[in-house]
Amino acid sequence: MSVIQVKGNVTYPITIDPSVWIFDDRKFSFDRKGDSQDTYLQSAGDESDLDPERVIREGRIAPPTLKTEKQYEKQKLMNGSFAMRLGTVLKNAEPNSSATQCVFVTSSGKAAVSLETALNSIVHFSEAGKPIQEGGPVHIYFEDPVHHKQPITDVKEIEII
C-alpha cells in the first residue's frame, strides 16, 4: 500500500491513498487497447453504445433479481480496471490562486505540467481488480496524447507550484 503526498502551494497539504478509490463513486472504467497508448474511457452506466431503436422495441434488460445485480457489481469490481480524474482529488488540497504548475515526483525524477493539465489528467489506479503494482501506485495519463505519449508512473509525491 503506497500513499502519495500533495503539497506545495496549497491551502491544505494532503495525503492520498489510491487503494481506497475502488470504493469511490467518482471512478470510471478504464481500458488501454493493445500496445498503443490509446485509452478508452467509459463512465459507469454509459449506454451510448446501445441501439436506441432496439431499446424502444425490446426495452432495457433488467437483472432478474437484486442478488444477481450485486454479484455482477462485485464481479465488475474484482476484474475491472478503473481510473479517476486527478482534479477531483487535487481540489481537496485547494491550490492557491497563484499556483500555475504541478510537479509529479517519481523515483526516476520529476515531471512538470501546467496545473490545468494536471487537473484534467486521468489517474489509473486499478488493473484487473487489483492495485497497480508495477510502476504504481498510479499511472497518470493526459488528455493531450501529442505532448504526453507515455504515462507518468511510479509517482511518490505531487507538488503544486
UniProtKB/Swiss-Prot annotation:
It comes from the Bacteria. This is Uncharacterized protein YlaL. It comes from Bacillus subtilis (strain 168). The gene is ylaL.
